[in-house]
Amino acid sequence: MPVQYRPLNEANLTDLVCCPGGLELAGKEFTGRLNRVTEWHQARLREGMRGLVAYDQKTPRGFVEYAPADVAPFPIEAPGACVLLCFHWAGTQPEDPQHLAEERRMIEAAIADAHQEFTGMAALGWNHPTHYPIVLLCELAFREVARDEPIALLWLPFRDGVEEPTLARPQFRPRDLRARGVLAIDQAWSARCPYSVHFAERMRNVVSAHPDRERIDLRQYRIDTRGEAERLAASPWDWGWTYLNGEEISLFQYGGDTWREEIARRVASLPGSSAA
């Protein structure tokens, strides 16, 4: 039986693979309150978010979400268009060819679903082989209209002569407290993603457990809505950025215990530290 798609709504939110009980979370340990992910989806659906849930042999395996640009929680200006928010196929490794093939089919279904109502679809792609890959989106006729490495703003017009989307001007300015002998950590997160909820909680735990906690100033910024995305725009990928004393840290630069080690290293190198 081929994969079937059903419209996303509040009745089938429990079928989303990234919500509590979903396939993406199975067998993994997460920290933080993951029911926030369900609450985020409920709120965005009320604002006009659309989506499709993919079922393989009646088992929920994936989803794709998009929203009108004027409510989409990304720093993208695209009057009359929609914005691709998230897509994921669970149960395979990202490097598995089936993974990207199924994600491609889901996006194709979303494009067909959005084609009549909107002037086009904007998306953010990454210069990365499996994480929102630019190559995958370009295979679906998206074209690059702006770049903020490693992220590209991509555009698929549904009509001739429609206005291209643009990235909003960055509004957020990260802090640098080195002169005071303090490590400023500015971090964005969002309840839209269980990994983001988990990472934000893990960062809080790392900072609270540091022996020189008073030398760390952690500020976390929750970006769930369009207004928050505009006000706190620092990177196009507006809910995954981290700055250490003003230095932007790549989403993939550190993982696991390496964050603890990197923060300890930076605190030790601050002015006034015995190790500096």
Give, region by region, the residue ranges found by the protein language model.
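Short amphipathic alpha-helix that is part of the acyltransferase structural core
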Residues: 1-46, 51-53, 198-202
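Conserved beta-strand in the GNAT
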Residues: 53, 59-70, 83
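Conserved acetyl-CoA binding element of GNAT-fold acetyltransferases
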Residues: 75-98
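Conserved acetyl-CoA-binding loop-helix of GNAT-fold acetyltransferases
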Residues: 95-114
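Conserved GNAT acetyl-CoA-binding A-motif
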Residues: 112-127
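Non-catalytic, surface beta->alpha helical segment in thiol-disulfide oxidoreductase systems
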Residues: 244-275
